[in-house]
Amino acid sequence: MIYIVRDQKVMLDSDLAKLYGVTTKRLNEQVKRNTLRFPSDFMFKLNEVEFLALRSQIATLDIGRGKHRKYLPMVFTENGVAMLSSVLNSD
């Protein structure tokens, strides 16, 4: 799903992980290993206020017992999604 955050169209790391058939943990590990390829206009971490606002709008962000996120999610802009595809497919 595409969301609007900070006046930018973005996708959540968890949605992209499902799309690429990897875990969110693996996706974020690859991003950390390739940080120079992801400048701030490609991706950013949501702050707590942004995450709570987004969570209140999205039924798919499950907050049940044992289903909460340990960390605030990363979101990727269109350029970030393209770079992520390159990084994940190069493994």
PLM regions with names:
Residues 1-91:
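Basic, low-complexity intrinsically disordered segments
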